[in-house]
Amino acid sequence: MNDKWTPSINLDLMDVINTQSIKGVQVGSPEAFIFEIMGEAELPATRLSKKSKIINHLYGNVNFLSENGYVIAINIDFHGNREKMITLGDIGSWGVNDWFELSELKGWSLNNLDGVMRILGGGIVIELSKEGELSMVSLR
C-alpha cells in the first residue's frame, strides 16, 4: 500500500458507460484481474462487514466488489473526495436533457424517485440529482 495513492489509469466515464468495463475488468471477471489490470489498490481489500462474503477493492473513486473470486459489481462515486480514476470528461457539463437523450439513444429507462433520477439499462445504473448532476454509476 502506498502512502499517497494515485490512480495507475485515468479513464473518461463515457468509455466506461459504452464498454461497461474498466480496462477489461467487468462484472463476471475473475477477482485476480482487478489487481493484474488496475495495479495496487488504494487500501487493502476488505469485507463489507464481518460476516459478509463480499470483498471491496478501493481504487480512488471506484469500488470493485467481488464474491467467491468474481467481480459482482463496480461502483463509481462522483461525490466523494478520493482521487478520480474515472473522470467526467465532456459529460461533466451535462444536464437532465442530455441524460434523457442518452437513455433514449441506448433504450434505457429513466425513473424519478423522490428527486433522485435513475437511468437503468442492461447492467448499468446511473444516479443523478434532479438538476442532472451525476452522483453514482454502478455496473451490475
Q: What are these language model-derived features?
A:
Residues 1-140:
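Short helix/turn-capping signatures at newly exposed starts of structured segments
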